[in-house]
Amino acid sequence: MKEGETDDFPAIAEKLCDPAVVGILVGSPVYFNNMSALCKAFIDRCIAFRKNGFELRNKVFGALAVGGARNGGQELTVSSIHAGFLGQDLIVVGDGKPSGRIGATLWNQNDSIAGDEFGVGTARGLGRRVAELAGLINR
């Protein structure tokens, strides 16, 4: 960015630090078996939370990835996103029962995930798991 230009990060950062926010989901398309440059830039900028006393500590975190093929790098992408946030002292979860996967792994078929029942199921499971654990922690 040029000097004086701003983007959405300050507003997003403020929301993420809000004590009412107890769960965070981050997703990315899969590019060459990894997250997008935009997702990586977001993670890199999140270092500010760590430098400010681990402001995201103990929030529940999940990751999802959408690839152009089944087994098209989604698991690697989710793992990379997890790695970027483990250093923030977040509580990282997968999608839970019934599949018990690393996170949400979706397949974009013909510009839509609608036909990917398995992937949509992992996304629903991830959302449920983040909400479930956040509820337990914040009783």
Would you name each region that the model predicts?
Residues M1-N52, P98-R139:
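N-terminal beta1-alpha1-beta2 submodule of the flavodoxin-like/Rossmannoid cofactor-binding fold
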